[in-house]
A protein has these predicted regions:
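Sec-dependent N-terminal signal peptides of Gram-positive bacterial secreted proteins and lipoproteins
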Residues: 2-27
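Active-site-adjacent loops and short helices of periplasmic peptidoglycan-processing enzymes
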Residues: 20-225, 231-238
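Domain-terminus/edge residues, biased toward the C-terminal soluble/receptor-binding domains
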Residues: 200, 218-433
């Protein structure tokens, strides 16, 4: 029934719009605000709506160094178990600085490795995490717990991976470099699938630690905008936030302190990750919440040595600009008015409708906001409560930022043969009801 209803709506929909009453309707692009940033690629994103508030070459792919690790962390949290024991392979132990200096065969909990990954950006920890979480994913698939939904195992020789007595990764200390790389590819496959699901089609992960690399598909790279989108996803995970906000973590003989200096330099910082390689330059991504506003700033190629502080300057500039120019506006409230829809061939002639969501956006006074209501002129009975009969969309400067369904608020039966026969009988028998 709902499929036919959607077809009817598609054929008969009437679209009308409401232009939001704002102080000005002059369209101003963020590019017209020259913030004099050092970064070659930069973005300031509304962390709630995903709107680009400011951009500088924000859609141009570039290497992102250790900012990669925000995705590595969230994938490990989603696919691994924090208490699981992780074994260090020879390949993982061979990673260049910055290192935890884990030894081949050494074991850690995934939880401890995540602090090493995010607080000190250890490259060996990233590979240990990747290999062990990949093993756990393979174990889950082989056990039939869930399928290889994303097909990340397809075409890979996994004959060296077996779990005869339950999940145990101690065999990793004896595998070859090529076998390690297969496991890393499984993990980065999960990273890439997550990126695609977030709409990050220009992001390509090859390494879990962000070291520069290339393969047959392209370079290890993302865009400033997509890096910000990934961060906006990561901060929805409370465990991710807890790890990245920790000042210091100790485990065994190891101690790691948070290298994200911006946590103490700027009020409201929720999370952040630095990065540097010779190819990528200095990179940084952070999330900040101020007065109910969530800003995501991402910077790529933000100088090379000795310009290590450029990223802090640029990030402060972006966040200050966002705070100064943008405020929350309620576009769609709880009692947003919608016209009833005419019903044909129904026991009632009007269908009351409503939406279930509200919309608040970060706007600047120059923004042009249009609320577009897509509902049909009429609709044929029967209609049931909860049927989707249209949509309400919010556009800011012609960009779609919000969409929500319009729902039927009543059941209306069709006036069929039995209904008319009943009416005739009532008429002849002088029956009112």
């Amino acid at each position: 029934m709902k499929k036919w209803l959607c077809l009817v709506l598609f054929l008969t929909t009437l679209t009308y719009s409401i232009t939001a009453l704002l102080p000005s309707r002059i369209r101003v692009s963020a590019a017209e605000d020259d913030l004099q940033l050092h970064a070659k690629y930069a973005v300031l994103l509304d962390g709630d709506s995903g709107r680009v508030l400011y951009g500088k070459n924000e859609d141009t792919p570039a290497p992102m160094a250790s900012t990669t690790k925000i995705m590595s962390c969230v994938i490990a949290l989603e696919y691994g178990l924090k208490e699981m024991t992780c074994t260090t392979s020879a390949y993982a132990a061979s990673m260049p600085d910055v290192q935890l200096n884990a030894k081949k065969g050494e074991t850690f909990t995934l939880n401890d490795l995540l602090y090493s990954l995010m607080l000190k950006s250890h490259n060996d920890s990233a590979v240990i995490i990747a290999e062990n979480v990949a093993c756990y994913y393979i174990y889950q698939v082989q056990s039939g717990i869930y399928p290889d939904t994303y097909d990340v195992l397809s075409g890979k020789d996994l004959s060296f991976v077996s779990f005869p007595s339950g999940f145990d990764t101690s065999f990793l200390q004896n595998i070859t470099t090529e076998q390690s790389k297969i496991l890393v590819a499984v993990f980065t496959g999960l990273m890439n699938e997550k990126a695609v699901s977030l709409g990050c089609t220009q992001t390509h992960f090859i390494t879990p630690n962000g070291l520069d690399a290339s393969d047959e598909t392209g370079e290890h790279a993302t865009t400033a905008k997509e890096l910000a989108v990934i961060m906006s996803y990561c901060i929805q995970n409370e465990e991710f936030l807890a790890i990245t906000q920790t000042k210091e973590h100790q485990f065994g003989s190891y101690s790691v302190s948070n290298a994200n200096a911006f946590l103490n330099m700027y009020d409201g910082v929720l999370s952040g990750k630095t990065g540097f390689t010779g190819n990528a330059g200095y990179c940084y991504v952070c999330a900040c919440r101020y007065d109910g506003k969530t800003f995501i700033a991402a910077l790529l190629a933000c100088g090379w040595p000795p310009s290590k502080t450029y990223k802090w300057q640029d990030c402060r500039t972006l966040l200050n600009w966002g705070k100064e120019h943008f405020n929350h506006e309620e576009i769609i409230g709880k009692n947003f008015p919608l016209k009833s829809i005419t019903v044909t061939d129904g026991l009632k002639k009007e269908l009351p409708v409503s939406i279930h969501d509200t919309c608040r956006l970060l706007l600047r006074k120059e923004d042009l906001v249009n609320v577009v209501i897509n509902t049909p002129d009429s609709i044929a009975a029967p209609v049931f409560i909860g049927d989707i009969v249209g949509s309400v969309c919010v556009y800011v400067n012609d960009a779609l930022l919000f969409s929500t369904p319009v729902y039927a608020d009543a059941c209306i039966r069709r006036t069929d043969y039995l209904y008319f026969l009943n009416q005739v009988i009532k008429s002849f028998c002088f029956i009112d009801k």
